[in-house]
């Protein structure tokens, strides 16, 4: 588990996803732990963080029988964010990356915001893991569809203030990184058998 999360981290950083500095360390015996620097602290002082669950006005109860959408996060950024365009572009890049590695645990608590002087910005991405257990994202990409489909992401690109050229550029950057996932996995010590098992999680 830790090795796969570290793989996702290395791919994400290379693909332009903002993340806190992380590492993998052998803590006891043969077991490894994924370590990440806290981004809700700055020189020991608490930085105000809130999950997208909170900021979109949702609760576990309110979404029990329905699926939330990335477009709800877009709406919050448009209304309360600073550096809106850059944050929307980063969020869309994260959607594309989640599709590329099948990070299907992308629910509202796994997205967050940090309060800056002038307003809210996306927090660094966290809890990214490839998965072969689900066939769709936790969040819908449009209001109704959570398919692991790059074309679906492109269909909503205008809500993220992206031109077609900008979308293709981001897609190209993410896919060119993810296509080398097996090599990166081998470099960090993931066994060939595990790589074979996880193969279907990756698309580019």
Task: Describe the function of each predicted region.
Residues 51, 55-71, 76, 115-166:
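Catalytic-core segments of enzymes that bind and process phosphorylated/nucleotide-bearing substrates
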Residues 158-174, 182-186:
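C-terminal structured "cap/appendage" subdomains that terminate the fold
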Residues 11-15, 39, 55-58, 76, ...:
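Generic, well-ordered alpha-helical scaffold segments in large soluble proteins
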Residues 1-64:
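Conserved ATP-binding subdomain of kinase catalytic cores across diverse folds
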Residues 33-38, 124, 179-185:
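A short beta-strand motif that forms the metal-chelation/ATP-contact edge
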Residues 79, 120-122, 181-204:
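Regulatory N- and C-terminal appendages and interdomain linkers associated
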Residues 27-29, 91, 95, 168-179:
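Small/polar glycine-rich anion-binding or flexible loop at a beta-alpha turn
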Residues 1-15, 69-132:
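Conserved kinase catalytic-core segment
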């Amino acid at each position: 588990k830790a090795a796969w999360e570290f793989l996702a981290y290395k791919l994400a950083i290379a693909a332009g996803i903002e993340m806190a500095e992380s590492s993998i360390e052998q803590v006891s015996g043969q077991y490894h732990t994924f370590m990440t620097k806290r981004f809700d602290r700055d020189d020991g002082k608490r930085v105000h963080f809130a999950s997208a669950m909170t900021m979109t006005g949702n609760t576990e109860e309110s979404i029990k029988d329905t699926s939330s959408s990335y477009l709800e996060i877009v709406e919050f950024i448009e209304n309360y964010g600073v550096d809106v365009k850059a944050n929307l572009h980063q969020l869309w890049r994260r959607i594309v990356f989640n599709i590329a590695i099948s990070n299907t645990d992308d629910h509202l608590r796994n997205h967050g915001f940090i309060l800056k002087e002038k307003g809210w910005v996306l927090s660094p991405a966290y809890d990214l893991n490839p998965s072969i257990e689900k066939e769709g994202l936790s969040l819908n990409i449009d209001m109704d569809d959570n398919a692991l489909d790059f074309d679906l992401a492109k269909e909503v690109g205008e809500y993220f203030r992206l031109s077609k050229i900008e979308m293709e550029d981001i897609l190209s950057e993410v896919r060119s990184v993810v296509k080398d996932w097996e090599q990166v996995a081998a470099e960090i010590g993931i066994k060939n058998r595990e790589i074979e098992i996880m193969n279907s999680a990756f698309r580019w």
